[in-house]
Amino acid sequence: MPWIQLRLSANEDNAEKYSDWLSACGSQAVTFIDAKDTPIYEPLPGDEVIYWSNTVVMGLFEASHDMDKVISYLQSIHPDKEQMRYKLEQLEDKDWEREWMDNFHPMKFGERLWVCPSWRDVPDPEAVNVMLDPGLAFGTGTHPTTALCLTWLDGLDLQDKTVVDFGCGSGILSLAALKLGAKKVIGIDIDPQALQASLANAERNNVSDRLELYLPKDQPEFKADVVVANILAGPLRELAPVIIEYVGDKGLLALSGVLEEQAQTLQTIYGQWCDMEPVSVQEEWVRLNGQRK
């Protein structure tokens, strides 16, 4: 069945309202995407969500839907119909699931580590292979911040080490650490769905017996040999006293989800507790590394 996609330009103040409007008009699905390649929105405790400052809200309609009527309705309720920016696109009829799956390939990080979708053949059976499908939560290796952290983990000797994955998302960093030899990983995330995804992915990779998962309110007191936090600069700044408490004596720390212009502030903050190294850069994103003093 062919489809019509309606794209609306929005911002963090009106994105959710636009979503409601599209649903009211009969959209079969509503999707938010980032309009300017900024980080994925950061969920907050509770139900509050911060959207990107430049967001595209996309509604998917059956081709037979009266789109003139939809546009007229949206313009009638828009506070400034002259400023309502939209685009209509006809999507060809194809196997969208197959199209989506074809976009994901095994990816190598560092010298040993591969992340492989379950429907692809493993390129190197002797390598460290994490089987992970794009799904419930952010973090499947395709974003530079995740790639930076995976490459860092690959370069460490994690044999019998303990690791904290702060903001674990899909669990990709936890799984990588466990597959690379860590004896125990504690994953922490504010999103229960992320914890569900991490557990499911750990079970698929046969490492769930060494993974503990917690919401922040339940997180234990714990000192780790290695701490990795791939979130965003704001939470990394605000939660610095919490994150640093997980880093044991001479423990290693990696921070990502940070743009180049945000790095110096975080270097200064975490430099109170750690000997910080020069940042690693991929595209416009950085990873900060340090060792507890």
From Swiss-Prot:
<keyword id="KW-0808">Transferase</keyword>
<keyword id="KW-0963">Cytoplasm</keyword>
<dbReference type="GO" id="GO:0005829">
    <property type="term" value="C:cytosol"/>
</dbReference>
<protein>
    <recommendedName>
        <fullName>Ribosomal protein L11 methyltransferase</fullName>
        <ecNumber>2.1.1.-</ecNumber>
    </recommendedName>
</protein>
<feature type="binding site">
    <location>
        <position position="230"/>
    </location>
    <ligand>
        <name>S-adenosyl-L-methionine</name>
    </ligand>
</feature>
<dbReference type="Pfam" id="PF06325">
    <property type="entry name" value="PrmA"/>
</dbReference>
<dbReference type="GO" id="GO:0032259">
    <property type="term" value="P:methylation"/>
</dbReference>
<dbReference type="InterPro" id="IPR029063">
    <property type="entry name" value="SAM-dependent_MTases_sf"/>
</dbReference>
<dbReference type="GO" id="GO:0016279">
    <property type="term" value="F:protein-lysine N-methyltransferase activity"/>
</dbReference>
<dbReference type="InterPro" id="IPR050078">
    <property type="entry name" value="Ribosomal_L11_MeTrfase_PrmA"/>
</dbReference>
<comment type="similarity">
    <text>Belongs to the methyltransferase superfamily. PrmA family.</text>
</comment>
<feature type="binding site">
    <location>
        <position position="146"/>
    </location>
    <ligand>
        <name>S-adenosyl-L-methionine</name>
    </ligand>
</feature>
<feature type="binding site">
    <location>
        <position position="167"/>
    </location>
    <ligand>
        <name>S-adenosyl-L-methionine</name>
    </ligand>
</feature>
<comment type="function">
    <text>Methylates ribosomal protein L11.</text>
</comment>
<dbReference type="InterPro" id="IPR004498">
    <property type="entry name" value="Ribosomal_PrmA_MeTrfase"/>
</dbReference>
<keyword id="KW-0949">S-adenosyl-L-methionine</keyword>
<feature type="binding site">
    <location>
        <position position="189"/>
    </location>
    <ligand>
        <name>S-adenosyl-L-methionine</name>
    </ligand>
</feature>
<keyword id="KW-0489">Methyltransferase</keyword>
